[in-house]
């Protein structure tokens, strides 16, 4: 016991002798996640990671998960604190307050808590807090103060302590536990055996964590007794140089065979090596949220996760970029750097700083022993003929060790270069002019300024023809030839894209102009500037602000405030962007200093940044991407897929996930996706497409979510991929789903519609058939009618023809009747002549008629007889022509006499009264009287036309 106290005192003295503060100039980047960021409890007690890369934290409010972009909380059913978590057997086992169980995905890919309390007897279900969970093989062990539980194949076994179980952990893949009265126990063959007796342990010994250490041993941290090394032979104190052992240690984790991290209750985090030497320390001063570390974890990419008393912090251990911003800099901006004669120098807005130089592989591990040797703005550091010079706001200085000697104070100096073919001639650009110096015997002698140029010369370069090229911010580019003292201004008239924003640099012994439209070169033959054909293939016509060649021949550049490198180490040039520094470099005063292939320094807004470019390229792990969430958007969003395809800790398929079928009215979707590349989230871009909707992949962008709304019925595959700044792409991950037809278009509806359509078609067919039949019948009737009409028309025409013929015949008969009537008239006249003759004879003086006269008379009488025969013939013809008119008339009116029948016949022939009078040998008056009498016999009203009456008989 005495030796233990001596050890503690020695450790305290060793610690007290250490220099407090930042030990090295370089500092790793720290990312802090505050409580308001992850929206859960304050404290985080344990940390785990699954094979997909997601992180899990035992949090005061539940199990907290993080995938690089999204946080999600899984509270326990009883809403209590989660003290412990352990990834085992493809499940995340969880220990809380009076709760024990595991998280595992359901069929929808969402994590669901499954309680294991039902496996315990009722008497064992009140166990308070589960502080530790460990597993070996299929055995899962849980520790509460009063019990140890072992889960194996769905069965739970309970182990009681002699008094209290203080700790549970693993030593060389064996389960150990600290029993308050018996000491450290080891689980062997189903039993707990004493491994380290209590009397061999320090007083008030309380283990807080254990981790693998050197081969066959482990490191133990305690709350009061410092650090210990545990082996099969026993336990002994362990000292870490630079660490006070007399403090509360909370956790220790092995990073690799050379590096370890150690968490404390009040002093932050230590990083130490296999030699037990502190390499780095991290506290609130270096950027942690607080110094109280509850848990530590090293993920698969060697990143360090810290569960703090308030929040979560993250350090990318293998990050190739470090901050160079010691407290001495006072957050001054970094403008230039140089290494000269075992000294490293920094030019900043706060002065010129010197640091003793050791040739290390990683210069960020140079000890923080900075000295400000010259206060005030320093623009440029450069070595001329093995002498270091500094261009400052108040003049040109020569630097030697920790001293700054004035060379010229006529003006502030931006830049200085030697002539390519005359190394002793130094060309300087100042605030007001270009001034020449002769470098001789380690001293600069002022030769004088160039009279043909006046103005600020911040950017200049020289070539082998003794030309000095100066770019002016708004005039163009000047060429000053020292041979003939000529000066010429080049503008857009001489090939430059503009007189604005031209910057001259010398790359690979060639003068180049970085412009708003790409890189331009000088064509000496044409005395013009032309776009460089070589750089056009790389940059195109994009704006370039800065160019610098490193020791390997790679070309660093700044484009739209973004830093990049033309990597020439491969078979063809490739561009590598450094997005981690976007917005952090010193815009307008960009500076890159390349010391060797492991150390490149970039001027920043606060200090500098160191990049190990070789490591930067090597650190790019194969990219993974997964779809973490698929939601159906609506009045209330519902999760369709929760991001887990299979068990929580198994390698999961990235393609053809899902195959969900979604109702038509739920046809708007929200997709979330992420690549759990924690150390380089700023380097990632994503591209997606929805097969069945998008024709092409989207442009690369930083978004990690995508919405699709009002999708039509059909099958869809959402695909997404990631790429980093090295243009490495991840495999494509995909999610399949189907938007079902609306209810009125589902299979049953379609079947019903088919049947209904068949019925409708049948009915339509019948209707059409009936319609066609009716139309056919109508057409037949119409044809028959037309035929009938045609027949009737034909009949009418025949009748008309017959009538016309009859009329013709009637006219002919009437003509004959008229002729007959005329003959009768003539004969009547003839009779009158006979009468006259007889009267004449009667008056003749001759008393007797001679035979000749008698014969003549007889002959006339014979003709009279013939006349009567002709009337009979006339009657017959008249009846034939006029439909037996006389017969019908005599039958209808038998009272009519012969002369009245004749009168009727003549009237029927529509003869005039005069003509009738002649035929009937009466006067016209007599005809009228006869007509009157005839009307009376026929009983014809006065208003009836006699001819019309007779015509209708």
Q: What are these regions, as identified by a protein language model?
A:
Residues 49-52, 87-90, 135-137, 170-172, ...:
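Residue-level detector of Asp-centered blade-edge/turn motifs that repeat once per structural unit
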Residues 21-49, 76-82, 102-129, 163, ...:
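Residue-level "micro-hotspots" composed of small/polar
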Residues 54-57, 91-94, 139-142, 175-177, ...:
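Conserved beta-propeller blade signature
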Residues 932, 936-953:
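Basic, Lys/Arg-enriched C-terminal extension of HTH/homeodomain DNA-binding domains
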Residues 60-64, 98-101, 146-149, 180-184, ...:
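Loop/turn residues immediately N-terminal
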Residues 866, 872-930, 948-951:
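Helix-turn-helix DNA-binding segment
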Residues 322-326, 759-832:
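Cytosolic signal-transmission helices at domain junctions
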Residues 67-70, 105-108, 152-155, 188-191, ...:
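Short loop/turn segments that connect beta-strands within beta-propeller blades
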């Amino acid at each position: 016991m005495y030796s233990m106290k001596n050890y503690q005192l020695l450790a305290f003295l060793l610690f007290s002798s250490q220099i407090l503060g930042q030990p090295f100039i370089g500092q790793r980047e720290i990312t802090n996640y505050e409580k308001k960021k992850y929206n859960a409890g304050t404290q985080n007690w344990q940390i785990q990671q699954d094979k997909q890369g997601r992180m899990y934290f035992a949090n005061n409010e539940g199990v907290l998960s993080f995938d690089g972009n999204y946080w999600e909380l899984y509270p326990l059913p009883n809403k209590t604190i989660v003290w412990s978590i352990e990834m085992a057997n493809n499940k995340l086992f969880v220990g809380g307050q009076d709760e024990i169980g595991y998280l595992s995905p359901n069929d929808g890919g969402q994590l669901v808590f499954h309680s294991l309390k039902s496996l315990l007897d009722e008497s064992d279900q009140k166990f308070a807090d589960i502080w530790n969970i460990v597993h070996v093989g299929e055995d899962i062990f849980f520790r509460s103060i009063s019990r140890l539980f072992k889960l194996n194949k769905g069965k739970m076994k309970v182990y009681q302590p002699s008094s209290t179980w203080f700790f549970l952990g693993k030593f060389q893949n064996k389960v150990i536990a600290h029993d308050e009265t018996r000491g450290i126990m080891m689980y062997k063959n189903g039993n707990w055996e004493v491994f380290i007796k209590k009397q061999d342990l320090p007083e008030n010994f309380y283990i807080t964590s254990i981790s693998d250490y050197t081969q066959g041993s482990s490191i133990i941290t305690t709350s009061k007794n410092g650090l210990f090394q545990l082996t099969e032979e026993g336990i002994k104190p362990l000292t870490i140089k630079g660490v006070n052992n007399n403090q509360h240690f909370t956790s220790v984790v092995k990073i690799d065979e050379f590096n370890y991290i150690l968490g404390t209750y009040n002093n932050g985090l230590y990083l130490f090596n296999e030699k037990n030497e502190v390499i780095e320390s991290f506290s609130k001063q270096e950027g942690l949220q607080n110094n109280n570390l509850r848990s530590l974890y090293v993920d698969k990419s060697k990143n360090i996760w810290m569960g703090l008393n308030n929040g979560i912090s993250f350090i990318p251990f293998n990050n190739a970029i470090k901050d160079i911003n010691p407290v001495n800099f006072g957050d001054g901006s970094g403008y230039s750097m140089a290494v000269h004669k075992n000294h490293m120098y920094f030019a900043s807005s706060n002065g010129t700083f010197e640091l003793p130089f050791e040739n290390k592989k990683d210069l960020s591990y140079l000890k923080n022993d900075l000295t400000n040797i010259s206060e005030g703005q320093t623009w440029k550091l450069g070595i001329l003929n093995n002498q270091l010079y500094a261009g400052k706001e108040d003049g040109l200085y020569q630097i030697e060790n920790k001293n700054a000697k004035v060379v010229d104070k006529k003006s502030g100096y931006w830049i200085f270069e030697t002539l390519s073919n005359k190394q002793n001639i130094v060309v300087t650009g100042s605030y007001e002019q270009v001034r020449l110096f002769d470098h001789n015997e380690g001293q600069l002698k002022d030769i004088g300024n160039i009279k043909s140029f006046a103005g600020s010369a911040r950017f200049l370069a020289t070539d082998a023809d003794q030309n000095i090229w100066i770019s002016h911010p708004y005039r163009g580019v000047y060429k000053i030839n020292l041979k003939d003292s000529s000066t010429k201004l080049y503008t857009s008239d001489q090939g430059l894209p503009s007189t604005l924003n031209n910057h001259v640099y010398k790359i690979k012994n060639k003068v180049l102009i970085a412009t708003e439209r790409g890189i331009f070169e000088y064509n000496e033959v044409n005395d013009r500037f032309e776009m460089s054909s070589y750089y056009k293939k790389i940059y195109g016509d994009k704006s370039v602000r800065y160019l610098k060649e490193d020791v390997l021949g790679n070309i660093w550049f700044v484009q739209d405030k973004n830093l990049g490198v033309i990597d020439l180490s491969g078979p063809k040039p490739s561009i590598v962007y450094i997005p981690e520094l976007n917005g952090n470099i010193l815009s307008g005063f960009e500076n890159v200093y390349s010391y060797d292939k492991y150390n490149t320094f970039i001027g920043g807004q606060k200090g500098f940044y160191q990049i190990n470019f070789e490591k930067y390229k090597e650190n790019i792990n194969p990219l993974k991407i997964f779809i973490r969430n698929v939601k159906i958007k609506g009045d209330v969003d519902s999760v369709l897929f929760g991001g887990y395809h299979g068990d929580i800790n198994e390698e999961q398929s990235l393609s053809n996930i899902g195959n969900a079928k979604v109702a038509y009215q739920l046809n708007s979707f929200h997709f979330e996706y992420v690549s759990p590349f924690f150390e380089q989230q700023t380097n990632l871009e994503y591209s997606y497409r929805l097969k069945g909707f998008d024709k092409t992949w989207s442009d690369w962008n930083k978004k990690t979510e995508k919405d699709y709304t009002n999708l039509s019925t059909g099958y869809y595959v959402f695909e997404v991929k990631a790429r980093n700044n090295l243009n490495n792409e991840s495999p494509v991950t995909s999610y399949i789903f189907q938007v079902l037809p609306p209810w009125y278009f589902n299979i049953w509806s379609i079947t019903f519609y088919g049947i209904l359509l068949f019925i409708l078609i049948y009915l339509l067919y019948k209707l059409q058939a009936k319609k066609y039949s009716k139309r056919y019948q109508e057409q037949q009737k119409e044809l028959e009618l037309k035929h009938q009409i045609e027949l009737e028309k034909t009949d009418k025409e025949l009748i008309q023809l017959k009538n016309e013929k009859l009329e013709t015949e009637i006219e002919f008969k009437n003509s004959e009747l008229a002729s007959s009537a005329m003959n009768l008239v003539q004969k009547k006249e003839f009779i009158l002549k006979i009468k006259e003759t007889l009267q004449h004879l009667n008056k003749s003086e001759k008393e007797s008629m001679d035979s000749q006269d008698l014969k003549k008379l007889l002959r006339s009488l014979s003709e009279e007889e013939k006349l009567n025969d002709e009337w009979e013939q006339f009657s017959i013809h008249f009846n034939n022509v006029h439909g037996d008119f006389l017969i019908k008339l005599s039958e209808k009116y038998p009272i009519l006499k012969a002369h009245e029948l004749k009168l009727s016949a003549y009237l029927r022939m529509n003869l005039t009264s005069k003509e009738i009078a002649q035929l009937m040998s009466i006067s016209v008056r007599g005809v009228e009287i006869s007509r009157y009498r005839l009307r009376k016999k026929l009983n014809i009203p006065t208003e009836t036309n006699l001819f019309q009456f007779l015509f209708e008989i």
